[in-house]
Amino acid sequence: LHNRDLVAVEAGAGFTLRDGEDGADHEGDGEHGGDAGHDGEAADHDHVHLDPHIWLDPQGAAHIVGQIRDALAAAEPEHAAEYRKNAESYLQDLAALDEEYTAGLAQCERRVFFTTHAAFGYLAHRYGLEQRAIMGLAPEAEPTPKALQAVVEEAREHDVKYIFFETLVSDKVARVVAEEIGAETLVLNPFEGLTPEQIAAGEDYLSVMRQNLTNLRLAMGCR
């Protein structure tokens, strides 16, 4: 960070951030229903947790690419044409991904999905879905038994067949909810890191997002 030639890019600048979903009550937060916060701020209902996961919306990812393109072109004008060319190619890939999501999630039996980590709010909003998070923006937080039971009851009401969890975090809570309602667990990857196996297999943002779409379509009963 002390490198004077380092280019810092505020990738989300200019993109409208959404309030984060706090999810269920967490151990140590007290009983504040779905409005409970994190990091000891449960009682501060005026504190807003902004959701940073804009890259999980393909259009948000496109915004990030544009920000990086412009910053690099400004920092190295002699390579600006190359940066713009590469960015344009990737933006076309992202536009195709966006179209796949739009078509793939257009006709589904369910519009609500349950996940341990509230990382998919932008994706849900973009494609007309509703995210229900068990553990809010902090994927390691433990919900209280009372809050967990409320999640179980709501999942039953929606006839949920799958509870999502993410690759790099324990699936314990997802399994508890799934077992209570006779559902299964399935991965919804927030692309916050790749396993060594995924790296070796050449996985990237596009492949992970397409697998997410496949899993969403299965869970939502899409045609």
Predicted regions and their residues:
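Extracytoplasmic metal-acquisition and chelation regions
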Residues: 1-223
